[in-house]
Each structure stands twice: as C-alpha cells, then as structure tokens.
Amino acid sequence: MADKILGNEFTNNKKVKLIAGEVYDNMPYTKKAKSYMTQGELEGKKYGNTYSIYLTDPGEVHDGLEATPDTVTEYAVPVTLKNKNTSVELDAWNKLGDIESFTDEIARPRGRKLARSVEKEVIEDTIPKAFQIVVGSANFKTLTDMSKALDEVSMAGTKVTFVKPTVAGTIANGGLANFTPSEIQSKIYKDAYLGQYAGASVIEDNLMPVVNIAGTETASFAVASVSGNGDESATVVGYNVTGFTGSPNAPYKLEGVKVIGLDGMETDQDFYVIADKDGKIPEVRLAVKGHNVNNANGWVETGSFTPSATLAVESGKYALGQCRDEQAVGFDQYKFSDLPGSENATESVGNVSMKMSTYGDGKYMTTLTRLDLPFACTLPEPRRAVVGYFKI
C-alpha cells in the first residue's frame, strides 16, 4: 500500500527533492563533475550568456639557489549558461498525494527524461575536448591504452572510463573476471558501473556518441608565431593556433606536435584535436622545445614549424568512449529570479539542483508547475581526458 502523507506534509520541496534524486541517478557522466564557478561568481548571470572560467599554469623551475619568481599565467575558458525545463498542469502536480504515485507518475518519468536531456548535451559539449585519442576494437587493450595515455601526461586524479553498453558488453565477453569490483564506485554509479580496469572505473552510458567517418575528411589549421622576450625578442619560441577547419567528430593528428604534460614537462604523446558540432576545437598553445612560454599545452621541435593536420582514423563507424579525470568535466548551476506572484522551491541531490515554480496564466486561466535545471558545462583542460574510437 502506498505511503500516504497527510495534510501538507507532502510539500512541494519534498516533491522537488524526489525529482532531483531521479535526475541525479540518471546522469552518470555528470555525477562526479566538478564545480568551477562559485555561487558568488554565478550571481546575476543570465541564461544564454557566455562567461569565462580561469585556469593557471604550472609555473617555472630554475637551477641553482637564486630564486627567480615568475608571473602566474591564467588562461580563459568560455562557458555558456543553458537550461532544460519540463512543466505539468497544477492539477496533475497536486492530485498525487502519496509518495509512490507521485514517484511513478511524475518524478521518475519526468526526472529521467530531464536528466537524459541534460546528460546528452553535456556529453556532446565535452567529449570533443581532448588532445589524445586511442583507436581500437572493443577490448581490454583499448581500455588500457586510454588509461595509460592519461598517465603519460601526469594526470593525477581518479580515472573513470565511459563507454556505450554494447561496447561494455563486448569487452566483458572477453573476460568479465578482469574487472575488479569497488563498493564505493558501485554505490555512486549503481547499475551503470561495470568495474575497475587499468586503474579506471568503467561506466556504461548509452548516450555516448556513435559517429560515421567517411575517410575523406580533411582539416587545416593556421598558426601565429610568438616571439621571446629580451635577448630572444627576434626568436620564435611558440605558436598560437589562430584558425581551424575540420569535420565534426573527426579526430585529426597535428603533425609534428606533442603534448605537454599537466606537470609542464614535454612528453612524446602525439597531439590530436576533435572538432565539436560547431566545428570548433579547444585552444591550442604551442611552445618550441625547451621554452616555457604561452602556458603551452603542446610543443614542437623547432621555430620553423609548418602546420598540417591529417585524419587519424580510417573510414568506418565508431562508438566513442572517454577516459578522464573524474572531475575533469565542469558542471555548474546558476539561479533564476523568481517570477512575481509565483510559488517556488529549490532542492538539491548530489551536484544537481532543481527549481520548481508554480504560477498562473491569466490569459488562458491555467496554472502550471514548471521544473527547471539551469546549468553550465565544459571540460576546461583537454589534457585530462582521452577519447576512444571503438570500431564497430
């Protein structure tokens, strides 16, 4: 029998809390995302506007005893404020006076749909933000290569790998016993959690993209040289990528470019870019070997660098996966102002906050209950993620 809550005990806040819980449970990709903006920074921000978050460089290291202080260099990462909403007529909202009915008819279906809509957008916005890729079959080797690529750039966080359920199933058929269970991660990700492998928690998410590569995709990029200071004022010590054209979701190798690790050290890892749905790539800042300049994320051998990009995969169909620092993705929420004359409630579960507004429409003599999930998402540091192209 349903658990009845009499009188006004089943409040709007409790209803919103139930929905927020459903949303949180159905967003595995976003569950452990990090907040990069404080509520103070978000105060007064408006839907649709683009703002910046700022990250700093690892600084310089010098030989000897003499201290040589350097300036902290920041670089800006743009982030756009978005919103998803769903609404129901007030009668439907109010008529369900017990937890079980409200959960079955309102909280679960609407919470899940809202969650998956937000999750899809977060994935689409952040998956292309990576400077390393791994191409392979749905097997344990590809999972290992993705995880170890993060180790090569000194990524020190907790690693998680997201793949489509069909990819996870194919891999598991090759030896489910290879996955090591983790009670903590199982509680967080629930049924989406497959297990630990190669130092990463493997999570299923059916919204991970599938892309078709024709094999004829081309790309080009342009660079502007950066000169040094003082005695090196006439020397090219780095480059900024000033233009890029390429096909969305196709990975391109930047020839002659290697990744600079998160510790500021030059690595031997090849440098890739993936264009997003708008054809844009993350900011690429290059240093000439041996120079600490420009808060660089990649390096080239000499100051006579000629830019070129080549398609990094053959033609075919690929399911995309991602191995990343668990908190590499940024997920922030901002607040709407209350509508005049409306009743409002806001509740949070995990890193998800939901706002409910009930208001009347005098023109049509109706009353609606509206649920909003305002958010901003990004992956500000592409070196903290690796994208897997699983051939299917």
Feature-to-residue mapping (PLM):
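N-terminal "assembly arms/tails" that initiate or stabilize quaternary assembly
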Residues: 1-76, 385, 389
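Short, Lys/Arg-rich flexible segments
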Residues: 2-37, 89-101, 110, 115-134, ...
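Surface-exposed molecular-recognition determinants
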Residues: 7-15, 162-167, 354, 358-359, ...
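Short, low-complexity, charged/polar segments at coil/turn and helix-coil boundaries
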Residues: 36-46, 139-169
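Long, contiguous amphipathic alpha-helices that act as assembly "spine/axial" helices in icosahedral shell
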Residues: 53, 77-138, 151-165, 254, ...
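Short helix/loop capping segments that flank catalytic or ligand/cofactor-binding pockets
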Residues: 61-64, 170-173, 378-380
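Internal mixed-charge
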Residues: 108, 261, 275-385
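Autoprocessing Asn-cyclization modules and mimics
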Residues: 169-295, 392
